Regions:
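Conserved N-terminal segment of class I S-adenosyl-L-methionine
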Residues: 2-125
Length: 125
């Protein structure tokens, strides 16, 4: 299984992977439900997160529900606790948007949020 995933990640362009990774990982997340790890982005708990990394995968790095990594969850907590980012509706352009932030930012800021990327099929521009 690891060899298959590694092969897909090396050979299939990222823009195609982004179209199918959310439903597939969501299904995997259903089977990983538990109370050990909580993702602050979606407020869901899992008994474990998925490993992530090519050379030496980090255990419990990828949240199957939000597709966030450690750095994304840390940034989310910083924005939530140390800034007023979620207290008001802001107008901003998000260059190379992280997939885990797109839905929450869209919900919070509505039409004022504009994700932009050269290759991502998820970005608006």
């Amino acid at each position: 299984m690891k060899l298959l995933i590694s092969f897909i990640l090396r050979k299939v362009p990222r823009k195609y992977i982004q179209r199918v990774d959310e439903p597939i990982l969501g299904l995997i997340g259903f089977f990983l439900r538990g109370n050990t790890y909580t993702c602050p982005i979606i407020n869901k708990s899992y008994r474990k997160f998925l490993p992530y990394g090519r050379v030496k995968p980090r255990p419990n790095a990828l949240c199957p529900g939000s597709l966030s990594l450690e750095r994304h969850r840390l940034l989310w907590l910083f924005l939530k606790k140390k800034t007023d980012f979620f207290d008001k509706q802001l107008k901003f352009l998000h260059i190379a948007p992280e997939q885990c932030f797109m839905k929450p930012f869209e919900k919070q800021h509505g039409d004022e949020y504009l994700p932009a990327d050269l290759e991502s099929p998820l970005a608006k521009v």
